[in-house]
Every structure is written in structure tokens, then in C-alpha cells.
């Protein structure tokens, strides 16, 4: 699981 923090970027 990752949080979207941009266009197609995961944090």
C-alpha cells in the first residue's frame, strides 16, 4: 500500500 503524493508517485 502507498499513498499518492503527486501525479503517479507513491510515498
Swiss-Prot record:
What's a single GO MF annotation on this record? toxin activity
Disulfide connectivity for this sequence is 2-11, 5-10
Keywords in alphabetical order? Disulfide bond, Secreted, Toxin
Query: What broad class describes the main subcellular location of this protein?
Result: secreted
Tell me which positions the record assigns to the signal sequence. Answer: none
- Tissue-specific expression: Expressed by the venom duct.
Q: What is the annotated localization of this protein?
A: Secreted
One GO location term (cellular component): extracellular region
Q: Does the keyword Cell inner membrane apply?
A: no
Q: Domain comment, in the record's words?
A: The cysteine framework is XVI (C-C-CC).
Any idea what this protein is called? Answer: Augerpeptide hheTx1
Question: Lineage in the entry?
Answer: Eukaryota, Metazoa, Spiralia, Lophotrochozoa, Mollusca
Amino acid at each position: 500500500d502507498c499513498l499518492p503524493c503527486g501525479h503517479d508517485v507513491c510515498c
